[in-house]
Amino acid sequence: MRRRFLLLSAPLSLAGCGSLLPAQKYIPRTSWPLQPQPPNYIPARANGPVLLVRTISPAPGLEQRGLQCLTPSGSLKTDYYNLWAVPPAEALTQGLINWAQASGHFSAVITPGSRLTPDLIIEGELSELLVDLATNQARAQMTVLIIKPALNVTGFAQPVTQAQLTATALVQGNTPGAQAAAQSEAVANLLTQVMVLLDRFSP
């Protein structure tokens, strides 16, 4: 009888062990926007070139949405409680479309699948978006390829230029919100460089 009592009480004892562990603190997740706005809006040129913006691809590790920082020791850390609202490469693609439309350089800015024929194509890869804690700076980096499409079905597309662009912004504070704001500013500075490049090679 005593043995049966011990066996029956064992699950209750094990269940009671859970109450001895400290309760895990709830940490809410926050989504931060990555939507740098163009500095101004200029109406489209009626006779301007047509720009095709291909989707910017993410470098390995940048497919995820967590904010990243580089520690003074050189290790990369990802914050899984502070996230971008959309993956950074997607946000950069949309930002490039918005900035190109607002620049006034182009009669139309299109994406793959459009029936319009482009005069210029841009594609690239987002290779870095983080806060460098050693310098207290946000840093954004991408590789850009600008292409002139083939003039006819028998022709070949011609790369016009390739460039690796880097932009920074000072982090004003030590909160996740300050880090997100600085990275957004760095992306805006990056897009400014891209627009200068596009203006240089626009027909």
Predicted regions located by residue number:
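Surface-exposed short loop/turn segments
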Residues: 19-32, 38-41, 98, 103-154
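Short secondary-structure boundary motifs at beta->alpha junctions and helix caps
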Residues: 75-82, 152-193
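Extracytoplasmic/secreted envelope proteins and their assembly/folding machinery
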Residues: 89, 93-97, 184-187, 191, ...
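N-terminal export leaders
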Residues: 3-7
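A structural "domain/chain start" motif
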Residues: 18-88, 201-203
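Sec-exported extracytoplasmic/periplasmic mature domains
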Residues: 97, 101-105, 195-203
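Soluble periplasmic/extracytoplasmic beta-strand elements of cell-envelope proteins
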Residues: 50-55, 68, 121-125, 139-145, ...
